[in-house]
């Protein structure tokens, strides 16, 4: 079972990614496969919650450029701007994901 929480009250340094914009874009583009809060309910679609922003940014840019290929992700990433990628990566990185053993106390 997974629990996801967003750290509220975090401020962004000047020029940093816009987490709010990232949430909006991710909801529109990514949530169908990767879940509304980055926890996938789809087989073969990885969880994105709590992944490091630098990792997500690099992978999305690799899909966009063709350096990395996937039937769906290459098409999804192609029109994304650097700013949109940074924003979505920051959104997913801002999420926390706690993984519990099956049957563990809640």
Enumerate the predicted regions with their spans.
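Cleavable N-terminal signal peptides
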Residues: 3-4, 14
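N-terminal signal peptide c-region/cleavage motif recognized by signal peptidases
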Residues: 9-13
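Sequence/structural segment immediately N-terminal to covalent heme-attachment motifs in c-type
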Residues: 17-37, 49-51, 101-106
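Gly/Gly-Pro-rich "capping" loops immediately C-terminal to redox-active cysteine motifs
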Residues: 23, 38-68, 74-79
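Conserved hydrophobic/aromatic "anchor" residues
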Residues: 26, 63, 91-92
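C-terminal capping alpha-helices of c-type cytochrome domains
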Residues: 68, 78-103
């Amino acid at each position: 079972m997974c629990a996801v929480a967003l750290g509220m009250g975090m401020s962004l340094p000047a020029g940093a990614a816009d987490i709010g914009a990232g949430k909006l874009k991710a909801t529109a583009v990514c949530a169908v496969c990767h879940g509304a809060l980055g926890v996938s309910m789809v087989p073969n679609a990885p969880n994105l919650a709590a992944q490091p922003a630098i990792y997500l940014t690099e992978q999305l840019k690799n899909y966009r450029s063709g350096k990395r290929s996937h039937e769906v992700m290459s098409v999804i990433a192609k029109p994304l701007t650097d700013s949109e990628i940074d924003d979505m990566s920051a959104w997913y990185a801002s999420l926390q994901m706690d993984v519990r053993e099956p049957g563990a106390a809640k």
